[in-house]
């Protein structure tokens, strides 16, 4: 009851503070998280600075700084007007102010904000969780489990004991002596010890070990039974104390290992027994009986176990010096059959000084002359090398020598977890998975009491700077070194580790609060805060390493020399990331067969929006290099799955919609969607798609007949070249540059059938084009069931030289002045567009076909139908809708040439509706889905819709896929994004559910696109982005082949039905009824919506929906949104559509409309698709248009 009260009264427990603006015109330059409230907004010198209860945000002209308050270690004023902020992750931030008084004001504010909390509830993680729960409390479902880690974390101890195969009958047992932490407050409640060691002996051992941290087993090698144990140092002191129970326990660990390995059936052969236990001889199972549960039974064993390795992380001098403080080390004389090794690792004070030296070095000038020598003098890489060598020594002992190992340092909570966690990571592939790594951190760092609060400085009144040390960061750096040496052995990527570094200090999540599990239990952090694993979950593709192979090395043996280690630049080195979106750029990959140093001819180089494209091209300025602040290449792929629609084309007097300053994906000619992120040249995407196609598809290499003309194009004069570029652009602008040939060919099928029926003299040609565009394996060349006739491709190709000059050359497209203007498709190099980019040829050829095919339509084709060009009408007459109002991929005109140089003319059945009746989505069964009107969107969505989600859908919930059966589906398959965790999803959810108005538009808003769900900068990895592109290309090829197979099957069925109708004399009636249906203005007319006019399944499906009530999909079966495919988690809730019964996220199911078919006559929640079909058609007047770009002539 108390917890529910906390959720309801979150705004009273954690109230928002009053916003203080230094300038009334200033706005908060970021989207706030749940429970976050901005307290101050002001102006620095050439920057906007904002301070909330979670972060400090400084937006400069060319970059921005976004850092959680708890990540800031100190703030000081330098040079009177400059604030100097030192961060705990090695970053240093400098901010200049115009006046001394203003600098002092912000110095006081920041010092008050970063001060260690007086009570733990002052940390932001508690307010964040409470406000999250308050938002969720308004819903009927329970969402508390989404803040929690997975079952693999909560049940980690039991699962690990079973997974590692401990013999709990004879060798080991689980002791509950530390239940409720009554023995040791920094140890877990359950401990694995030898089976014959009693709890009384453990209590005696606890009195002899530092902080009562007794030897406890934490890992077992599944093959040979050798274990790793950890503990604190023995309290020998100057008096040389000893403890018989402690000596017995240490020796019993080695004996239990031998017992465990021998008692496993077939675990150790005679040969392996002799190798593992050289003094044991041939041992039989008779020597092991069930009486091992008491000490007397073990004494009777005639077993000689392996020699136990005691690894002391300290140097021998430090261990002896600790005897003056009551500590010490094991004396070999008192511990027979044990070997003591000292590793000489530095203590926390030396590590802290080394890290401070590294931080000072990394904040110097970008290219110091003595960089390498200065880096060596910090000894940071040297400390990493020693740590790796220590872990590798444990791996050698356990894996190769089959010896048990006992690890300790002084207290056992700093260097000890570093060594044992790194050793387990090297030994066991499970810990190199996302789930296994979470378990590893929970068990070795959290359960065994690493003092995160003291080491990170966010504990209650933790003002002692001598207790602070980046111990966990140092260990993560070692994991990063392993990732570099073994790139295929880790399921998670570098972004995963970077996020973990940030949230070790950020206090957004409660995972790393307090010093041990006992304190976390007392503060109820698990119930009152969110877990960091809810963000770094296994299903989040943003943190997945695409190079990972589960069949990689079982045990890793890294090279530990300093010369083989590298500085972790993503964490330590300052970088301009994330900068403002206008700085985004990415150097294109060189085209196959070209030198990367020489730009290809006739190729417009990548430039900034303020550059002169023509001048830059003529001067051959080198291509801009990619900066870390530039947008992800994956964003191109994220937009690949979005809906695509073609507008009707008429006169050239209309203006072209522009790209606004907030970088929304704009719509250019013909409804083609172009990403406004000026980061990737279209030619680069073509190269990527072509490479993926060549690698994955079995299609033969295309003939290069049409490319023989390319040298002539390259030889043209500059004026002719410019004219050619403009001419090509006029016919290409409506085409999405990301689409490759395979994707466009996937839309062959019913559309061509419908078109060919209207043109009898070209019916055979169109049918053969389809067949020739399919792979040989799908055409079934050995089969004679579908006889086709190859078209005369040569004649069509020969006409190209005569057709291209006919395109008007005076048509130019103005780029406007927006900083975020992308490269237009007309600037794509001629030779890199691929066969399907030369649409001016296809356009004119279609006109030629039209002129030969009989009478023309009297009505203008609608947006969803085939948009045709005339010889004089090159620009669209109608402006395009906003990105938030894009229709699906249904009923799209595709023009392409197949890889075999076969020209494919693909046309949808034309729509006879007037233009104002055609702004609708067409689904396969004939239902028309209208566009959402801007006036019907909830408050706050005007801003949110400007940020596309990784799945290619806008934040307001516009879906980009249709989930109908494949045989009746025209829309292209939407592929899952590499970033399933949508950016700023927390913030969108807050604005859409809590009713809090979003911040107004301001020049500061573009910086939001660089902030992730957690309010932190987005980390991008170009290698992983390239791998995601290849993976998407592969998936695209697979889906294309599946679609082609299905469409071929549907075509065969249609052909069979056609022949049957001809035989019965009914075919003529079907054909003659087509013009009537095209002229029919009824929205339920099916013949213009479905390309399978003879399909009976679609009619059966409609009848079934009319007669049956919709059954809801159970909650537990839905892990992803049915529309945008985003995973359900902390910031994405489940909602049922009352019409179709599927489960959607809140953005995709936020409309309400009566559903009479389900007996719901009051407005009920429905998805976007159902809302469009149930709501009256929106007029084109309601569609808000983007800022137009004037079409000017140069």
UniProtKB/Swiss-Prot annotation:
Which residue positions does Phosphoserine occur at?
Answer: 4, 609, 629, 643, 647, 904, 1060
Zn finger intervals (FYVE-type)? 1115-1175
Q: What is the reaction catalyzed?
A: a 1,2-diacyl-sn-glycero-3-phospho-(1D-myo-inositol-3,5-bisphosphate) + H2O = a 1,2-diacyl-sn-glycero-3-phospho-(1D-myo-inositol-5-phosphate) + phosphate; a 1,2-diacyl-sn-glycero-3-phospho-(1D-myo-inositol-3-phosphate) + H2O = a 1,2-diacyl-sn-glycero-3-phospho-(1D-myo-inositol) + phosphate; 1,2-dihexadecanoyl-sn-glycero-3-phospho-(1D-myo-inositol-3-phosphate) + H2O = 1,2-dihexadecanoyl-sn-glycero-3-phospho-(1D-myo-inositol) + phosphate; 1,2-dioctanoyl-sn-glycero-3-phospho-(1-D-myo-inositol-3-phosphate) + H2O = 1,2-dioctanoyl-sn-glycero-3-phospho-(1D-myo-inositol) + phosphate
What GO MF annotations does this protein's record show? molecular adaptor activity; phosphatidylinositol-3,5-bisphosphate 3-phosphatase activity; phosphatidylinositol-3-phosphate phosphatase activity; protein phosphatase binding; protein serine/threonine phosphatase activity; protein tyrosine phosphatase activity; protein tyrosine/serine/threonine phosphatase activity; zinc ion binding
Give the residues the record marks as binding a 1,2-diacyl-sn-glycero-3-phospho-(1D-myo-inositol-3,5-bisphosphate): 322, 347-348, 410-415, 451, 455
Q: Which keywords appear in this protein's UniProt record, sorted alphabetically? A: Coiled coil, Cytoplasm, Hydrolase, Lipid metabolism, Membrane, Metal-binding, Phosphoprotein, Zinc, Zinc-finger
| Domain of life the protein comes from | Eukaryota
Residues annotated as region Disordered? 583-609, 693-731, 852-871, 876-897, 932-971, 988-1017
| UniProt biased composition (Basic and acidic residues) | 693-724
Compositionally biased spans, kind Pro residues: 589-599
Q: Which residues form a coiled coil?
A: 1025-1058
Subcellular location(s) per record: Cytoplasm, Cytosol; Membrane
**Residues involved in a 1,2-diacyl-sn-glycero-3-phospho-(1D-myo-inositol-3-phosphate) binding:** 322, 347-348, 410-415, 455
Q: Which InterPro entries match?
A: MTMR3_PH-GRAM, MTMR3_PTP, Myotubularin, Myotubularin-like_Pase_dom, Prot-tyrosine_phosphatase-like, Tyr_Pase_AS, Tyr_Pase_cat, Znf_FYVE
Residues at the active site: 409 (phosphocysteine intermediate)
Q: Where is the composition biased (Polar residues)?
A: 991-1006
**Phosphothreonine occurs at which residues?**
725
Keyword check for Zinc-finger = yes
For this protein, the record's PANTHER family field holds:
MYOTUBULARIN-RELATED, MYOTUBULARIN-RELATED PROTEIN 3
Say what the protein does: Decreases the levels of phosphatidylinositol 3-phosphate, a phospholipid found in cell membranes where it acts as key regulator of both cell signaling and intracellular membrane traffic. Could also have a molecular sequestering/adapter activity and regulate biological processes independently of its phosphatase activity.
Q: What is known of its domains?
A: The coiled coil domain mediates the interaction between MTMR3 and MTMR4. It is essential to bring together CEP55 and PLK1 during mitotic abscission.
Oligomeric state and interaction partners are given as:
Forms heterodimers with MTMR4 that recruit both CEP55 and PLK1; occurs during early mitosis, regulates the phosphorylation of CEP55 by PLK1 and its recruitment to the midbody where it mediates cell abscission.
Family (UniProt): Belongs to the protein-tyrosine phosphatase family. Non-receptor class myotubularin subfamily.
- Protein name per UniProt: Phosphatidylinositol-3,5-bisphosphate 3-phosphatase MTMR3
The gene is Mtmr3
